[in-house]
């Protein structure tokens, strides 16, 4: 199938459905996922659609991305995430005061952290428990607990984080885009991330390369503001 025809068919699907997944395109057109992602990247760069994690949305659609649960995320790209997490953990020094964002890749970091003298602040209940059980000094941010991501959010969390000055911060993201920045589906999580980033001296985004050129609903940082740790 010619590239132009293929891309027009993708745009036609978007016109009808407003949003479309890579799987839906694959089933409809009978082409590979890698080809689909390349087409979506091209069409996004041309301003004909917005590429998001797992698919695309129409330019004029009211998009609100659905957040995957922690258990679902754990099954996605584990090998790549662990490689990123191991490299990130090696950057922690004994005197560091660390902010550890909620997320599967930041969670994998805990398996590789060697510096027991570092102090950790996190808004992730699972991270706090794992750190404490492993003998680390950890502070769990208080606030409203979000069920799907098991992250603490809300005004109490934001006010708590504003009291700290972190030497380093390690963050997760749902989307990475030069044009749209770093994005996440949930406005409350975006506010917590944005607040924590302001309190960090050095900040890192941990992301597998599949999230590149993807866009979620809410931007929490501009591209170029943060060091990116990835698998490629």
Question: PLM ranges: what are they?
Answer:
Residues 119-120, 168:
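A residue-level structural signature of the nucleotidyltransferase/glycosyltransferase Rossmann-like core
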């Amino acid at each position: 199938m010619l590239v132009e025809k293929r891309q027009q068919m993708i745009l036609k699907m978007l016109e009808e459905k407003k949003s479309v997944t890579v799987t839906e395109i694959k089933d409809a057109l009978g082409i590979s996922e890698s080809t689909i992602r390349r087409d979506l990247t091209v069409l996004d760069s041309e301003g004909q659609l917005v590429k998001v994690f797992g698919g695309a949305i129409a330019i004029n659609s009211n998009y609100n991305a659905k957040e995957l649960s922690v258990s679902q995320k754990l099954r996605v790209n584990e090998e790549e995430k662990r490689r990123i997490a191991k490299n990130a953990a090696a950057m922690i020094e004994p005197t560091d005061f660390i902010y550890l964002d909620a997320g599967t890749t930041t969670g994998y970091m805990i398996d590789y952290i060697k510096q027991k003298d570092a102090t950790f602040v996190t808004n992730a209940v699972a991270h706090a428990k794992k750190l404490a059980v492993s003998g680390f000094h950890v502070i769990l941010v208080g606030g409203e607990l979000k069920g799907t991501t098991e992250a603490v959010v809300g005004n109490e969390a934001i006010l708590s984080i504003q009291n700290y000055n972190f030497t380093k911060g390690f963050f997760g993201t749902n989307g990475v885009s030069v044009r749209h920045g770093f994005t996440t589906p949930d406005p409350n999580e975006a506010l917590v991330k944005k607040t924590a980033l302001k309190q960090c001296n050095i900040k890192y985004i941990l992301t597998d390369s599949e999230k590149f050129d993807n866009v979620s609903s809410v931007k929490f940082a501009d591209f170029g503001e943060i060091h990116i740790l990835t698998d490629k």
